[in-house]
Curated annotation (Swiss-Prot):
Protein's name in the database: Probable ABC transporter permease protein BRA0749/BS1330_II0742
CDD domains: TM_PBP2 (cd06261)
Family: Belongs to the binding-protein-dependent transport system permease family.
Protein species of origin: Brucella suis biovar 1 (strain 1330)
InterPro entries recorded: MetI-like (IPR000515), MetI-like_sf (IPR035906)
Residue ranges that the Swiss-Prot or TrEMBL entry lists as coiled coil: none
Description of how the protein assembles with itself and partners: The complex is composed of two ATP-binding proteins (BRA0745), two transmembrane proteins (BRA0749) and a solute-binding protein (BRA0748).
Amino acid sequence: MQNRTLPYFLILPSLLLAAVVIFWPVVHLFEIATHDVNRFGQLREFNDGANFTALFATAEFMNALWRTAVWTVAVVGGALVLSIPVAIILNMDFYGRSVARVIIMLPWAVSLTMTAIVWRWALNGESGMLNSALHGLGLIDTNIQWLASAATAFPMQILVGILVTVPFTTTIFLGGLSSIPDDLYEASSLEGASLWQQFREITFPLLKPFVNIAIVLNTIYVFNSFPIIWVMTQGGPANSTDILVTHLYKLAFRLGKLGEASAVSLIMLAILLVFTVIYIRISTRSEQS
């Protein structure tokens, strides 16, 4: 009996610490989200979920919710599509492979805020590097307002999001590729398998657990990503690039609606929890089958 209960006693301090660090803020958020709150965070009367009702009644929140889904799917999906071939190339034995790996990983080591500042400068409509390059190549005659136009601002931010997510995803896939025995490729080559057949029958099936890890971690990371959107456009022009996290920031620190901002936080937490649980169950069942 003592041997059975000992592990629980050993992890009890960590569980208590996790409860204080994680669950107490969530409980406090729920308390704020279900009460009227002034700008100074003072709770008033219980409002019976009026903050949630007010959110879903506004077009700004619904647009931010939809845009968050597009942002997350596009960035995570784009990063996966780019990272797999990059990881396969970097896993090959060629001269300068170590240097190439360092170059690919460098953007991951740079602050995301600084990266967003550099891209904001590069995409400047008047003196940005991208417009200058396109002018030099003779592809455009007039400057394009990349971040000042609703039609181009969000797609460019998605592109930047993909580029800054690729290094982390590539690192995960490199770890997966290094665990695949070379004997499998040698045996398939002797059987006359092409590179595409090797990828389809060997590489990708054995890489699936790492793909699942990348999807879950990147979804959480991208879903909550604040610097790229905020630094580049602050959700503009005219809230056309707002996602949930920037909409939350505006509600809390610009409009002083702390109750609605807390409600947004709880909705975001619920979305991530539901996604993570469902995806892990689906991936586990597919691996077992």
